Design a protein with these regions (language model features):
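Bacterial N-terminal signal peptides that target proteins for export
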Residues: 1-11
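Bacterial N-terminal signal peptides
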Residues: 9-20
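Short, solvent-exposed loop/turn segments at the edges of secondary structure
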Residues: 14, 93-94, 167-169
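Bacterial Sec-dependent signal peptides at the C-terminal "C-region" and cleavage site
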Residues: 18-29
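A short beta-strand-turn-helix
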Residues: 27-43, 71
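Structural alpha/beta surface segment adjacent to cysteine/selenocysteine redox centers
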Residues: 41, 49-132, 137, 205-213, ...
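Soluble periplasmic/extracytoplasmic beta-strand elements of cell-envelope proteins
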Residues: 44-47, 78-81, 171-173, 189
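C-terminal cap of thioredoxin/glutaredoxin-like
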Residues: 62, 129-235
Length: 235
């Protein structure tokens, strides 16, 4: 079992890597319809995932409902889904496009949930049927899906995941909502569909410590610039 201290070591390494590879303005987190929970939640959990991944479905079925009940619905954690299709084309990419096209109509999460519920039965011909089931404008969805809109954004998500050092799905990042990762408060990288208790241990530890006040000066440190260039600065 991966220990919390090892997770923090992995995260610190990922933060350094991101600082070297990411442009200064990369990926400020905005509400694009793929966020569950309160914007004021002190902790943010980001998932990098593939709709065709068995372990991702395991997280969706077994762990996410418990996180939702204990932390997300209670205003302690906000949850973000990010795409990490394991191939450059095929059903995994098409599923990500379908979810984004549903999101364009304000129905991202119903499609997200449907796709994971149907994992193993997904194929190219199924997505328009799901759009009908969840009540989307079928003409608008078909145009969005057939044109493969959002591909650039989908692959940008995947680039972020690989910069964290994730080479499989799912992968998770825990950060403080106000301020994002810093040298003093690094992100927590959680590779794989670990049990609920491991998420809870890290979340509870973060909740138990007083969050840094927004705008509070960071003590000078040779790695401060790395943290400031992180693509996960929250506004």
């Amino acid at each position: 079992m991966t220990t919390p201290s090892l997770l923090r070591t992995i995260a610190a390494a990922g933060l350094l890597l991101l600082g070297q590879l990411a442009p200064a303005d990369a990926g400020t987190i905005t509400d694009d319809g793929r966020i569950r929970g309160s914007a004021d939640a002190p902790i943010t959990l980001i998932e990098y995932s593939d709709f065709t991944c068995g372990y991702c479905a395991k997280f969706f079925q077994e762990t996410l409902p418990r996180l939702q009940a204990k932390y997300i619905d209670t205003g302690k954690v906000r949850f973000l889904y990010r795409d990490y299709p394991r191939a450059d084309q095929g059903v995994g990419v098409e599923a990500a496009v379908a979810a984004r096209c549903a999101g364009a109509q304000g129905r991202y999460w119903p499609m997200h949930d449907r796709l994971f519920s149907e994992r193993g039965r997904l194929d190219s011909g199924s997505f328009k049927g799901y759009a009908k089931v969840i009540g989307l404008d079928q003409t608008a969805f078909a145009k969005c899906f057939d044109e493969r809109q959002y591909l650039e954004s989908i692959f940008k998500d995947r680039q972020e995941a690989t910069r964290w050092g994730f080479h499989g799905t799912p992968g998770f990042i825990l950060i403080r909502t106000a301020g994002g990762p810093t040298e003093k408060e690094p992100a927590i990288a959680i590779p794989g569909a670990v049990p609920f208790n491991e998420f809870a241990e890290e979340i509870d530890r973060m909740l138990a410590t007083a969050p840094r006040v927004r705008g509070e000066p960071i003590e000078p440190h040779e790695s401060t610039a790395v943290a400031q260039n992180s693509p996960f600065i929250i506004h």
